[in-house]
């Protein structure tokens, strides 16, 4: 196996994409840091290296750098926050929120004050978890999400963001912004954001499982919004694409939901038999992967279509 310094790998990919050091590091570090990393004169934090690799769409698990015990603990805490966020979104379990907040506090004790990447992760998580007595209002959530994205993308503008470079967490924030515009009643902006975000991911996503999983998340939300405005043909095509990616990369988090969107679109298009079969697949897939709440929602949706 050929081995090269991580700085050399980053430099090769940056030049392949015709990116300047300034473009790559915007919002997360100084150009001099990139220069020193590429020349092997500096070993930045694991947090920063991961962010750079994500912006370059280079899977971080294929590249190795010396890391300290604290950096490994920070990475572990960040992964736990992501886990509790997903758990809370899927179940609305109060205990998941409690565990997430505890993990925020542990990460804050470990991270440096200037660690914008961890700050952003915590702020995004808080937007998901809401307050003790319920979710934030759409207006409050929008302010939090814009504040979060601009920690590392200071010039972010929702009307033309697709020329930027984004980490995994930044992509999730943009996706959340789109969903929040939907809750604010501005579905046209939500669909526009998801359309451009899906195009960005089509261009930048390589074949690694993690980035493909994020792509299925965006495609599901895009297709779901298209159904809501009556664009059933487009919704079906987008959802099929997401379904095929799930199968291709072996990641099934959004697989039941994509099948359910396809079922709903087929129903509105007058294809009752196809719709019924897809609803059954969606329901049993949700049950099989332990998504009981989603399985129940799919079942209720299927019953409404039969009435």
Predicted regions span which residues?
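Alpha-helical adaptor scaffolds
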Residues: 176-250
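Flexible helix-coil transition and linker loops at the boundaries of alpha-helical arrays
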Residues: 70, 106-118, 133-134, 150-167, ...
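DNA major-groove recognition helix of helix-turn-helix/homeodomain DNA-binding modules
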Residues: 47-63
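Helix-turn-helix repeat elements of alpha-solenoid scaffolds
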Residues: 89-108, 134-156, 186-200, 230-240, ...
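Short alpha-helical DNA-recognition segment
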Residues: 15-36
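"A position-specific structural signal for the A-helix of alpha-solenoid helical repeats
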Residues: 79-86, 118-128, 169-176, 214-221, ...
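A short, Lys/Arg-rich alpha-helix, primarily the initiator
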Residues: 1-16
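Structural motif corresponding to the intra-repeat A-B loop/turn of tetratricopeptide repeats
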Residues: 17, 133-135, 184, 222, ...
């Amino acid at each position: 196996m050929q081995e090269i310094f991580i700085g050399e790998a980053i430099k090769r990919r940056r030049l392949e994409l015709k990116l300047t050091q300034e473009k790559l590091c915007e919002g997360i570090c100084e150009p001099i840091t990139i220069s020193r990393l590429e020349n092997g004169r500096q070993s930045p934090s694991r947090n920063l290296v991961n962010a750079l690799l994500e912006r370059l769409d280079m899977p971080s698990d294929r590249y190795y750098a010396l890391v300290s015990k604290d950096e490994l603990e920070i990475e572990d805490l960040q992964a736990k926050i992501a886990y509790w966020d997903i758990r809370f979104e899927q179940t609305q379990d109060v205990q998941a929120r409690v565990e997430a907040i505890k993990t925020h506090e542990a990460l804050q004790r470990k991270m440096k004050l200037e660690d914008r990447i961890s700050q952003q992760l915590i702020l995004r998580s808080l937007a998901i978890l809401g307050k003790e007595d319920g979710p934030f209002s759409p207006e409050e959530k929008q302010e939090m999400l814009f504040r979060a994205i601009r920690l590392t993308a200071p010039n972010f503008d929702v009307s033309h963001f697709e020329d930027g470079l984004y980490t995994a967490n930044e992509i999730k924030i943009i996706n959340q912004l789109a969903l929040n515009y939907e809750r604010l009643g501005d579905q046209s902006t939500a669909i526009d954001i998801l359309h451009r975000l899906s195009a960005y991911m089509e261009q930048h996503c390589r074949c690694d499982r993690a980035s493909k999983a994020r792509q299925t998340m965006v495609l599901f939300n895009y297709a779901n919004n298209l159904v809501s405005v009556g664009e059933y043909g487009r919704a079906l095509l987008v959802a099929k694409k997401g379904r095929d990616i799930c199968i291709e990369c072996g990641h099934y988090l959004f697989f039941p939901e994509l099948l359910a969107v396809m079922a709903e679109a087929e129903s509105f298009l007058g294809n009752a038999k196809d719709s019924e079969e897809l609803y059954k697949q969606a329901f049993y897939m949700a049950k099989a992967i332990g998504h009981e709440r989603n399985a129940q929602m799919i079942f209720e949706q299927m019953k409404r279509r039969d009435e």
